[in-house]
């Protein structure tokens, strides 16, 4: 099975290549914090030899509570992304929520992300595809892995095959998510790169009444399980003070644990991808 290669600058993204990190913070809390977080990611990934793309959101449009922090908005967020790109010479990924956001965001960011909750919204999918940008498609919590072929088809029909799939857990009753490890292999059969969003897979949606809870203590175990499947990359959020983060702190990695965490995953990825394929069908 031939695996499609997606190129972002000088980074090659494919299921059979060394894993790429989409990493950063959940939402842009401030310019200074974004620069601090990116600086640490750059230091660690350069040391470990992991290709890196900075991730953050300018607007969290699907917060549980109307009182929850959403972010600085698109205009201010894009200014911060431009500064991060200039300062650290790294690509940037962010999510869009409305068709009108697609073109201006794609002019600044190297990858635009389709949120899981919106992944079946055809008008949004088509608007994203028509930018020609690389698209990271989050698998909705309510979709089976094999159903992702329909979203891929919408993008291709609109003229864009620069696509990445991303697992972020499946609904398991109320306020819980689980990750089906068999789903990775199903999505890899589409030949597009597959990522694992370990951070959001640790959520307990609505678990704190007016916001999502999380299981940060299990991030290493779940990340190792996912990356053992031979994936194109990992999606990760970290924060210097997760307990006081403005969004999804309960499932964010502590920033000071980033290096030992990624060092183990780098070793695991190298090992898994050194194995010859064993055909068992």
Swiss-Prot record:
GO terms (BP aspect): keto-3-deoxy-D-manno-octulosonic acid biosynthetic process
Keyword match Cytoplasm: yes
Enzyme class label: transferase
Cellular component GO terms held in the UniProt record: cytoplasm
InterPro entries documented for this protein: Aldolase_TIM, DAHP1/KDSA, KDO8P_synthase
Keywords: Cytoplasm, Lipopolysaccharide biosynthesis, Transferase
Location within or outside the cell: Cytoplasm
Similarity comment: family membership: Belongs to the KdsA family.
Protein name: 2-dehydro-3-deoxyphosphooctonate aldolase
């Amino acid at each position: 099975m031939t695996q499609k290669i997606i190129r972002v600058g000088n980074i090659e993204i494919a299921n059979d290549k060394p894993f790429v990190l989409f990493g950063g913070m959940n939402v842009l809390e401030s310019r200074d914090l974004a620069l601090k977080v990116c600086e640490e990611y750059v230091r660690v990934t350069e040391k470990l030899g992991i290709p890196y793309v900075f991730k953050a959101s300018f607007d969290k449009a699907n917060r549980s509570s109307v009182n929850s922090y959403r972010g600085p908005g698109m205009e201010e967020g894009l200014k911060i992304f431009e500064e991060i790109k200039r300062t650290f010479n790294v690509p940037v990924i962010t999510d869009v929520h409305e068709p009108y956001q697609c073109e201006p965001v794609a002019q600044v960011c190297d990858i635009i992300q389709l949120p899981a909750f919106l992944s079946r919204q055809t008008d949004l999918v088509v608007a994203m595809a028509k930018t020609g940008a690389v698209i990271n498609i989050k698998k909705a919590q309510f979709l089976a892995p094999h159903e992702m072929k329909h979203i891929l088809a919408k993008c291709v029909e609109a003229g864009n095959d620069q696509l990445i799939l991303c697992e972020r857990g499946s609904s398991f009753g109320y306020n819980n998510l689980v990750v089906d490890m068999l789903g990775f292999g199903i999505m890899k059969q589409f030949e597009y790169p597959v990522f694992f969003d370990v951070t959001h897979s640790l959520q307990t949606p609505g678990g704190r009444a007016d916001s999502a809870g999380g299981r940060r203590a299990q991030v290493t175990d779940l990340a190792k399980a996912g990356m053992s499947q031979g994936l194109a990359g990992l999606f990760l959020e970290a924060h210097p003070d997760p307990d006081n983060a403005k969004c999804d702190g309960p499932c964010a990695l502590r920033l000071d644990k980033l290096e030992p965490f990624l060092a183990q995953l780098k070793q695991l990825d190298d090992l898994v991808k050194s194995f010859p394929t064993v055909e068992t069908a």
